A protein has these predicted regions:
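Residue-level recognition of oxygen-bearing side chains
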Residues: 45, 179, 212
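Helix-turn-helix DNA-binding segment
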Residues: 144-196
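Generic anion/oxyanion-binding catalytic loop in active/binding sites
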Residues: 35, 105, 159, 172, ...
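N-terminal regulatory/sensing modules of transcriptional regulators
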Residues: 1-142
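Basic, Lys/Arg-enriched C-terminal extension of HTH/homeodomain DNA-binding domains
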Residues: 196-246
Length: 246
């Protein structure tokens, strides 16, 4: 089955699975027309391969919010790269990352080969027809600016939904960085009431049981060195190593 042969030349495909991620999150790629395929595990190896394989498509195992700084580097250097992040589950912050980077898409591991092939076709054509300038500018933000932008998008999107009054107040405080204990004090209620409001919101957005709501909707600025332009490490969320998502 060669679903892309009529419209696109054979792909160069990079299967990227950073240490700590589960390669079982990769989707079935048997229906893609692939000229070359390589599996990589380090950010340095990925960036070097993209240098040698311009126009290659990347399928990455794991959620994009846990690798935010890596994708920032990828789109800064190679703004037309198409990246698919594959996982069994995604959090609200991941949706915000997808909305920020034009050529990054979220896919579920169980996605059919036909749907994946069609998505790849559309994404690659889109990357070829759009100017790389916008992606370069978005990727040139400092780390704090990038994290603040992603968190702001999450805040606006989630608070625009029709939420119960208590849930909206709890969410707003948690997104502002308040702990559950501080949130309870500011609302004049008990920690259990805050916890119950959290559970309601987690069910609404399919957030796994073991992942705190604050970690699912907010990225923390990582501890990086002064030369952040060279930083390609991970932006940590508390859910980054949650077994529920692997």
């Amino acid at each position: 089955m060669q679903t892309l042969t009529r419209v696109l030349p054979p792909l160069r495909l990079i299967m990227f699975c950073q240490s700590g991620e589960n390669p079982a999150q990769f989707p079935d790629t048997g229906g893609l027309c692939v000229e070359d395929c390589v599996r990589l595990r380090t950010p340095e190896g990925l960036l070097d391969r993209l240098r040698r394989w311009p126009g290659a498509m990347v399928i990455s195992a794991g959620r994009p919010s846990t690798q935010l700084l890596l994708w920032q580097q990828v789109f800064l250097r190679y703004p037309r790269t198409v990246v698919f992040c594959s996982s069994n589950a995604f959090l609200p912050v991941d949706v915000s990352v997808e909305g920020y980077f034009r050529h990054l898409r979220l896919i579920k591991r169980a996605m059919s080969v036909r749907v994946l092939a069609r998505m790849a076709e559309l994404a690659i054509w889109s990357s070829l027809q759009t100017s790389p300038y916008e992606e370069e500018m978005k990727s040139a933000l400092s780390v704090p600016e990038l994290v603040m932008e992603i968190n702001s998008r999450t805040l606006v999107r989630l608070l625009s939904e029709r939420l119960p009054k208590q849930g909206r107040r709890v969410l707003g405080l948690l997104l502002s960085g308040c702990s559950p204990e501080m949130t309870a004090r500011m609302l004049g209620t008990g920690v259990r009431q805050v916890w119950l409001a959290e559970q309601t919101l987690k069910q609404r957005w399919d957030i796994p049981t073991g992942v705190p709501l604050s970690d699912a909707v907010r990225i923390r600025i990582p501890d990086v060195g002064p030369d952040i332009s060279q930083q390609s490490g991970l932006v940590k969320t508390g859910a980054g190593n949650a077994p529920d998502l692997c």
